[in-house]
């Protein structure tokens, strides 16, 4: 079994595993690495098939979580952004003893719109899958542009995301397709009710992929969890609002 790319840095007494989103890699954390590594031992990860973790095909959510867990510290705070939030949540469900706290960023337990549940229309996700086979570079760029729409620094934020993608080899089409399949089909709304560890959910008010309407719905469904919405952020609050984002993590660290 191949190992995935994994880098550890920082000297905090609390371990923090950072999982990126679809189409990306650990370079997305560059804007907050320095700040966080003063307070946490950071674990920067390229998910299987993404960035420097080459040699993997498409995976299910369960397989992806299993791979990441294999190289993880015994106990850590797990933070996942977007698709990474589903992977971190899956780890918390299968190995709660390894998860000191769970943090999901601009993530949803069910990305796809369902009956009485706001999300991405399934035909949009299917459209992305279709376009991937035709022009996957352009499809990834369109998806990145969607993530920063509406913020005051949208252009700059989109450039930051794009440079993270271009810094490393592009994932295989099958891997990208597999990631979209997870976003299209995963539904962890019920299972996550059972979590007992501290659980912090961070959102961007302007997010076009995870509608803000899900926040009060999940506040009600998971009363033990906490939520925070960054008023002027979209899908990548750690890029548009790095200071406030790091403060939220420091506040969580004080509680665990």
UniProtKB/Swiss-Prot annotation:
Residues the record marks as active site: 82, 207, 235
Top class in the EC scheme: hydrolase
UniProt superkingdom: Bacteria
A Pfam match: Abhydrolase_1
Main location, first listed in the record: cytoplasm
Residue pairs linked by disulfide bridges in the UniProt entry: none
Binding site for substrate: 22, 82-83, 143-147, 235
Gene Ontology CC annotation, any one: cytoplasm
One of the protein's GO biological processes: biotin biosynthetic process
Catalyses which reaction(s): 6-carboxyhexanoyl-[ACP] methyl ester + H2O = 6-carboxyhexanoyl-[ACP] + methanol + H(+)
EC number: 3.1.1.85
Occurrences of domain AB hydrolase-1 (ranges): 15-242
Gene3D superfamilies xrefs: alpha/beta hydrolase
Subcellular locations according to the entry: Cytoplasm
Keywords, sorted A to Z: Biotin biosynthesis, Cytoplasm, Hydrolase, Serine esterase
Metabolic or biological pathway: Cofactor biosynthesis; biotin biosynthesis
Keyword DNA-binding: no
GO molecular function, one term: pimelyl-[acyl-carrier protein] methyl ester esterase activity
Quaternary structure and partners: Monomer.
Function: The physiological role of BioH is to remove the methyl group introduced by BioC when the pimeloyl moiety is complete. It allows to synthesize pimeloyl-ACP via the fatty acid synthetic pathway through the hydrolysis of the ester bonds of pimeloyl-ACP esters.
Family stated for the protein in its record: Belongs to the AB hydrolase superfamily. Carboxylesterase BioH family.
Protein name: Pimeloyl-[acyl-carrier protein] methyl ester esterase
Organism this protein belongs to: Citrobacter koseri (strain ATCC BAA-895 / CDC 4225-83 / SGSC4696)
Gene (UniProt): bioH
